[in-house]
Amino acid sequence: MGQKVHPSGFRVGITKKHQSQWFARFNKNKYSQTVLEDRMIRDTLNKLFPELLNPSTKGGSAPKRHQNARIKKSRITQIKIERNIVPYQIGIQIHAENCKLLKSSIKNLQVKKDILVKLQKTRQYLTNLKIKLDKLTNAPAETQVKTNFEDSTKRSVGQLELSHEGLNTKLSKIKSLRKKLAKLKTGTSTTRANTTGTRQKKLSSKTKRSISQLLKMKLLRAKLAKLVQPKLKRKALEASTIEKTTAKTLKTKKKVSLKRKNKFETKLTKRQLKRQRVFKKRLKLRKFIRLRDRLLISKGLFLQKKGHKITKKIVLAPTPKFLKDFSLNPKVYLLPVKRIEKLLTPKKAAKGGQKSAAVKTVRTSLQTNIYNSRIQKKFVTMYVEQMKKKFLPHLNELFLEYTSKGFDSNNKAVLSLGYMKQWDFERRVDNLKVQPIEKLDRLVHNLRDKFVMKLNLLRKDFITFGSFSSNSADILGLFQLYNFLMKLKNLVNGLKLNLKHKIKTRLAISKMNGSLNTSRNEPELRSRETSQASDKLRIVDSTNSSLPQKVFRKKLENISNEYRKMKFIEYLKDVVQKHRTDNIYLYLASISESRRKLKEIKNEVKQHLDLYLPGANSIKELNQKSSEDSINLATNEVNNVLMKLAKKHPFDRTFLDCKFEELERRKTMWVQNLQLVPKISIKFFSVNQKALNLKASIVSESVVDALEKRKAFRKVIKTTKENLMRNSEIKGVKIQVAGRLNGAEIARTEWVRAGRVPLQTLRANLDYSYRTANTIYGIIGVKVWIFKGFTKLVTESTGA
């Protein structure tokens, strides 16, 4: 049958269960964990959506007709999985026929109690936030139209006053009318009893009275309906019940709490009790295993992993005398002597004293080498840390020197070495003023990134050489870029303020002239300039609103969709975390990497603590007295800085702000990686009907359905092949069926092919799928290959 071999060396299975195309980026170490995870995610999603689309009712499952119709509407063609930083970010793409139906089915998903509580809290928070934002947004709209608003408010206030004053009078009227109705009812009942026997006689005076009484009752009921409106009912009930409820609240709270406990406690079945016992046994076993592992680790008998090598830890030799004084922790300098003896002893060793002498020489040489290397490493790290601390202050001093000498003026005479035309602001001012604000914003962002890159390169040079000359071209170029960036920022801010001011003045003038309230007879007096200015102002407002604010607005527009999305993502996160804990031996390398990265971030923050946090000195002073107070103060400082950053627009952020935000983002990423929690993003893609019928997965499903309905396998294969070959896009088809076909005792394989199906070529665009049909006689395997032509190769240009 043949299998493709990927150019990078990994096999891409065509005849395997998972798809022929591979979308995960992976390294050598992380290949195994990504394969298992991707396969697990695909299986869970393929099983989950049919269950969600057909939830079981109380009486039993829904009828099969409706189930089949619903599944056909929402067929999943492909599930792509993309990875950015393995195993943290997972991007899932679901290609299906009817995506809306799949999204709506997520509401039937059952989640754990802890996750559900968190989701409910977030939903409540979002609803409260939406109400507050609506109030804020409606307030300025009301102030713009003052005249209409004042009239409406006066009317509403008058109505409220009347309702509050005349509430008691209306209630008294209602009581009197109800009493009259009760009297009339008693009178009518007696008259009806008398009139039952004498139906054939003429209407007496009593019966005439009864009719008049009924008419009166109708009129009274109509009056009551007018008086007793739903709003008045509510107000009356509120007024009467406030005093009663306040008195009873304290008494009822205790009773309700006791009742709730008894109400929600349900009796467990035998099966549930058995499960509980099993879980308890498992917990005991796990605790015992943990204790045993800890004891093994403490004794040094546990397996130890160093990089890619796994070795057993052997009892180590004691430390030499000269190393004990060097460090407080002597365990660091223990040497694996027994293992070295086995490796370095010669094959034909001499007897007695010669062997021991050889081992002693090896020991002494190793000890001296390790001692020297450790000292060198320590001094190198100290030197690097000192140079990193010196870099920024040294650069600031140089920049101040340049400004004092007049390098800021961008003269060619002054900047003979590092002069660059592109960073000359005075030459480009006239051209920049004409450009739109959006374009200028992008330019600022790009220049900032360029500045950061150059600064990092300079830092590396400074660490290696120890200093840099004041007349170097790189530093002068960086200084020129910095000045250009600062001036450009000021220019853009000035342009935005001018635009706002112009539009406000024009709007005020138009209100005075009455040009805003245009009618059919009066044409709109709006010039081209004002329309352009208003459009520009919209752009300015959109840029001023920061990115988190935009995200929040989108979320608040449709809370139900957001809740559904969060529910699905949290469910998948829980599934992946459970899978990772079960197969933790595959994630040992990623855990160690995340720990190393967190240490690096910690050291970086320690070095530049004065720059990142304004209250760093107070934290250091507190740390000497009490560690707990210093930790609390540090957390508060970090939270304050992050809050300020969130409020700031990206355009107004400094280099240090961007750096601090980046560090915080990296920290959260590596912490979640330690906890084996992934970051999942889901996208749904709708597939056209034409493209859907040409997918191998759907063709195989149709063959499986036909076989399960006891149709003849040869006819099914032939018809599917003919239907596919009618399409011009398809170049070749191959369908294979294997098992007890038509209930035969001996299993066999049958296959049909039309056109070309090259399985051995890498350039071939092949779509493959494998499904199993569960029949009465057993399982029948179905394989489908669809060839859609060759992919285009990048040909090298044949030039001179």
From Swiss-Prot:
It comes from Chlamydomonas moewusii (Chlamydomonas eugametos). One of its GO terms (biological process) is translation. Part of the 30S ribosomal subunit. Belongs to the universal ribosomal protein uS3 family. The large insertion sequence is present in the RNA transcript. The lineage of its organism: Eukaryota, Viridiplantae, Chlorophyta, core chlorophytes, Chlorophyceae. It holds the Pfam family Ribosomal_S3_C. The gene is rps3. It is found in: Plastid, Chloroplast. Keywords: Chloroplast, Plastid, Ribonucleoprotein, Ribosomal protein. Residues 665-800 are annotated as: S3-like 2nd part. This is Small ribosomal subunit protein uS3c. Signal peptide: none annotated. GO terms for molecular function: RNA binding; structural constituent of ribosome. Residues 1-118 are annotated as: S3-like 1st part. One of its GO terms (cellular component) is cytosolic small ribosomal subunit.
